[in-house]
Amino acid sequence: PIAGSMVLAAILLKLGGYGIIRMMQILPTTKTDMFLPFVVLALWGAILANLTCLQQTDLKSLIAYSSISHMGLVVAAIIIQTPWGLSGAMALMIAHGFTSSALFCLANTTYERTHTRILILTRGLHNILPMATTWWLLTNLMNIAVPPTMNFTGELLIMSALFNWCPTTIIMLGLSMLITASYSLHMFLSTQMGPTLLNNQTEPTHSREHLLMILHLIPLMMISMKPELVI
């Protein structure tokens, strides 16, 4: 069910990150040699989740693995125990909570009309649902973390903190973000572009669906303008 997916991605997955923040407070202060294997493991996990996203054919599976890959960055940022790392982790958790929930909502909008979640079978929707295509584009851009969204703020803080802590981590971070951009654009092009395969009549998007998307995306824009609310 769509509500379960949205709550799972937006809240329950982030509770794990919050638990790690609490647990790190009782551990000894950070030493590069001690925590480096865990940071590398978290970033490697993020890269593997991103690569898994690239080979997904199911829309909901792709979005779910996307959430897991972002949590890899969050865990790496929490482990190093720096103020910038913790701020970036908190910002990215909140931002990606909104983004992944919005993506699941859009996936359900597509599923209700096509009755399939296979990427290649849902293509050509920009001709039928142009407004939904706009929402897909905006949400994917937020998933990639373009400014001025909260995702950008979070990823910038995490990149700065990790690079300052250990410069070689930038290789894995850069690779992870490159693959994130690749699968996000792949998801957008697969679902929206090309000739449509639908023969039956498709109902237009409802005001309820547009309101849902507005309520997801507006907070992301607003919080990025005043990040003190969450950081």
Swiss-Prot record:
Its EC number is 7.1.1.2. The keyword Electron transport applies. One of its GO terms (biological process) is ATP synthesis coupled electron transport. It is found in: Mitochondrion membrane. Keywords: Electron transport, Membrane, Mitochondrion, NAD, Respiratory chain, Translocase, Transmembrane, Transmembrane helix, Transport, Ubiquinone. It is an enzyme of class 7 (translocase). This is NADH-ubiquinone oxidoreductase chain 4. It comes from Agkistrodon contortrix contortrix (Southern copperhead). The lineage of its organism: Eukaryota, Metazoa, Chordata, Craniata, Vertebrata.
